[in-house]
Amino acid sequence: MYRRILCISANTFRETIRNKILYAILAFALMVIGLTFFLADLSVGDLARIIADIGLASIHVFGVIMAVFLGITLVNQEIDRKTIYLILSRPVRRFEFILGKTFGLSVTLGLTTAAMAVVLFLVHLGYRYGGRAEAGIFIASAGIYMELILLTSLATLFSTFTTSVLSAIFTLSLFIVGHVTNYLTTVGDRSKSAGLRIGSQVLYYLLPNLEHFNWKNDVVYGGIAPLPLLGWGLAYLVCYGGCVLCLSCLLFERKDFK
């Protein structure tokens, strides 16, 4: 089983890493991050802080674009090409296919995120000569990478039962909602309606809370996210992402390709 998952992961990595659109997005992202060096000179304030803020935001935005674009095509592309029949005709179970595809794309996103983080590190180093801020760039980028893995899992889930366009819409919607989930508890606490309070609590636990991976502010202000926060983010990814992948595998097992 593990060998088959690893084989599918390796093939997925090779396919995604050769994607010309991926290179176009990555090249544009690296260019924007590199230009933060010049944008900072046009701004008033702490130049190193501005570079870190714009740079990490660029990694985040372009990472999400790559995760959503590649994630929604993981399953639908194989179905459209009819290669899914060839793959499943071999001794490959459907859940192995989903896990292998997701893990392979996660490796690709890891390499692209690392590349963008290194460029930002070098640009930022021009203003701050080493220290906590530079280390924090990689930690914040790790948080972004965890978020991208979760978004990939969600995109894979949606692609098992709907079209690529709808998968992209649903995934981007959850990306936006995932960064305001914390406000649901605030709305519920302030409401006088018991139904609204219960509903807000249910939605709070059902919807993804992507703020668990948001460690950018610590870096912008010259610090590093505390260790318990990092551990909680990783635990949340494993638990929530694992549940999403299990649901994806369950839906894909029941999918009819005829």
Features from the language model and the residues they span:
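Short cytosolic juxtamembrane segments of multi-pass membrane proteins
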Residues: 254-258
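Helix-loop-helix units of permease transmembrane domains in multi-pass membrane transporters
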Residues: 9, 74-106, 252
